[in-house]
Design a protein with these regions (language model features):
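Accessory terminal regions of nucleic-acid processing enzymes
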Residues: 1-244
Length: 244
């Protein structure tokens, strides 16, 4: 459901991390690092971009575009390597900016709405399946919890937008939130999207139909497929080329 991160890409990353003895392909990150190793200028562009603490989304966008221009101007790199590096720089820049912006967004919403948003540093997990001797779980950390005066908890997910407010929840964001709701045993969530000084809050409820018919079967299938591939022996060719 996430157009920006295909299933094969996620599978490769998990495969390499937890079953390195059978993984002989290359993850997208591996390919980007190989391309970066060919160019000192590209490495400098990435380092400089990550050191910029953008004050808002517009500045973060300008920072990435400046790095992109430097990479595109590097004639020592082929077009394919340039694109691998640009994708990597984009991901690193926007992820870093989103993490840095999270506190400001939470403080702004708390002040404007009079709500209590509590940071939760715990790592939550949800058991999915056991295949052979391997247990498969989904684990993650949430952004905030909103605590009402009566003590009721609402999950809060904060998203930094780079080009404007969506005013809606993307399917892949809803899947993430539904998984967190099941991990924590909660029924309600809020997605707070932020772009520069603007914020928008979208309320989301636990969707059991989506969970039963789409998300849970998808998790079971993913775990089964990953186990089958990771335990059959070394790859004969890069996993990323497998059809999904």
């Amino acid at each position: 459901l996430n157009p920006y991160k295909p299933v094969a890409e996620i599978r490769d990353e998990i495969w390499k991390k937890y079953f390195p003895e059978t993984f002989s392909g290359k993850t997208k990150t591996d390919a980007a690092h190989e391309a970066l190793a060919k160019s000192q200028e590209a490495q400098k562009a990435l380092g400089a971009a990550l050191n910029v603490q953008a004050k808002d989304s517009t500045e973060a966008q300008a920072n990435f575009e400046a790095a992109r221009a430097k990479i595109m101007a590097d004639t020592s790199l082929g077009t394919e390597d340039q694109q691998k590096i640009i994708d990597h720089v984009r991901s690193r820049c926007y992820t870093t900016h989103g993490t840095r912006s999270e506190d400001r967004t939470a403080d702004k919403v708390s002040s404007e709405e009079g709500s209590v948003l509590v940071r939760d540093n715990a790592t939550y997990s949800l058991a999915v399946a056991t295949h052979g001797t391997h247990d498969f779980v989904v684990a993650g950390r949430i952004d905030r919890l909103e605590i009402s005066p009566e003590g009721a908890k609402t999950l809060v997910e904060i998203k930094n937008r780079t080009r404007g407010l969506f005013k809606c929840v993307r399917d892949y964001e809803n899947v993430q939130i539904q998984v967190y709701l099941h991990m924590l045993g909660l029924g309600r969530a809020k997605l707070i999207e932020q772009y520069n000084q603007k914020t928008n809050t979208i309320e989301i409820t636990r969707d059991e139909e989506l969970w039963d018919n789409v998300i849970w079967p998808g998790l079971l299938k993913f775990s089964k497929d990953l186990h089958a591939k990771a335990t059959r022996g070394p790859q004969s060719e890069p996993c990323a080329s497998d059809a999904e």
